[in-house]
Swiss-Prot record:
The active site is at D255. GO terms for biological process: AMP catabolic process; pyrimidine deoxyribonucleoside metabolic process; pyrimidine nucleobase metabolic process. GO terms for molecular function: 1,4-alpha-oligoglucan phosphorylase activity; AMP binding; pentosyltransferase activity. It comes from Methanosarcina barkeri (strain Fusaro / DSM 804). The keyword Transferase applies. Belongs to the thymidine/pyrimidine-nucleoside phosphorylase family. Type 2 subfamily. This is AMP phosphorylase. Its EC number is 2.4.2.57. AMP binds at G167, S193, R194, A195, I196, T197, G198, T202, S263, K287.
Amino acid sequence: MQLKLEHFNIKIGQHKILLNIADAKELGVNPGDRVRIRGRESISAIADTTDDMVPPGTLGVFSEVYEHFVNWDKPVEVVPAFRSKSASVIKKMMDKKPVVQEEIKTLVNDIVEENLSEIELSAFITSSYIHGMTDDEVEWLTRAMIESGDTIEFDTHPIMDKHSIGGVPGNKISLLVVPIIAANGLLIPKTSSRAITGAGGTADLMEVLCPVEFSSQEVKEITEKVGGALVWGGATNIAPADDKLIRVEYPLSIDPYYQMLASIMAKKGAIGADNVVMDIPVGPSTKVPTVQEGQKLARDLINLGHRLGMNVECAITYGSSPIGRKVGPSLEVREALKVLESMEGPNSLIEKSAALAGILLEMGGAAPRDRGKEIALETLRSGKALEKMKQIIEAQGGDPKITSADIQVGQYTADILASADGYVIEFDNKWIIEIARLAGAPNDKGAGVAIHKKMGESVKKGDPILTIYAEKEFKLETALATAQRTNPIVVEGMLLKRIPGTYGFQ
């Protein structure tokens, strides 16, 4: 059937089209069926129907489909599409039947090419969440994800990389680790994410200083020029299947374990990483609650890395309270720059950054065994890491002269005060993140929270224990009300409760 295009300028995150009910009946297409659209290109899309949004003879297309037909002024041919082979692969996985490598590859290709509906994707995600995957299947999934998008091939090796499992607010260490590694002569092209449920991913933070959206080729050029890069992975077309899976995982609030392994390692494989250090924060409100679970995750990452030809080391790190004392893009960037400028900053930030950078320096041969942390600290003290950070900022289109004093934070503030003398005995990471998000982070770069008291520290009644920053007054009010209701930082005196004797004094 020949239909003229009508563009709906809306991005919905998938290939979807609208058919008039009359045209759909003639084609034999029901809502949720696939169709093949042929014009300048040939693509598949999921059909929906309407009796009034598009007239007969017209095909309504959303932006993701329209991108394939920009400036195409002729009718397109629309025909029913055959059922994807991946549907039967997903059915096998749901039935706990073994699959082969070619089936996994077909599945990933169909995900990237938008040949699967969200229902089918949800079935795949739920199946792997419930039934798990074998080591072979995880390796095949990872390799297919690498091959599905752009890859970077460097002429110089080794290539270093670092990844944090997440779940800890204020984890800004990449802003220190990357320049430390690059300042010691190793290449580290760090592709990072934006925050999905957090108050600021590394890409959100770096965007305070310079652009972060670059093609894979540009990432290679920046890295080869200055030794390192801190960019948003979503702009590179590296492992694009991952973004499409995340789109479905998010509303389900699940992150299947084996898909998480594949997602992490696919991004490392796509940039050609030889040596990778994994930061696994452990604590009650992190993604990895116990040391035992952290050790299992470490073993699985190391094993998968070995299968893919990567050397992986893991660091189990303390995750019960934030890294540093600031949460939110501009606040965190200011804190990180102060460390680079003068070593002035929280010990938790300096120690963790130096420890992880030290492991990478040893893995890359830039430091003898057990001296990596010492060399990382010296790189910070000497100003070499700061100079390298300035080079990275400039290479990515930012101002290399920017300092911590130049970083602007939200103009609206409110303090949470200690209700009694005592000590901080409880710290809820999840509510700290939520309060920062309600204040506007990460979209409002100046929003977030400053933490004045951490676990075990003493306080006096009326001392500020938390300051909320916002760029908009109504967001400050919402964040403040939530902080007062949830009490994310609990203060108690040394005497928790007095229990009187039954018989009184004699």
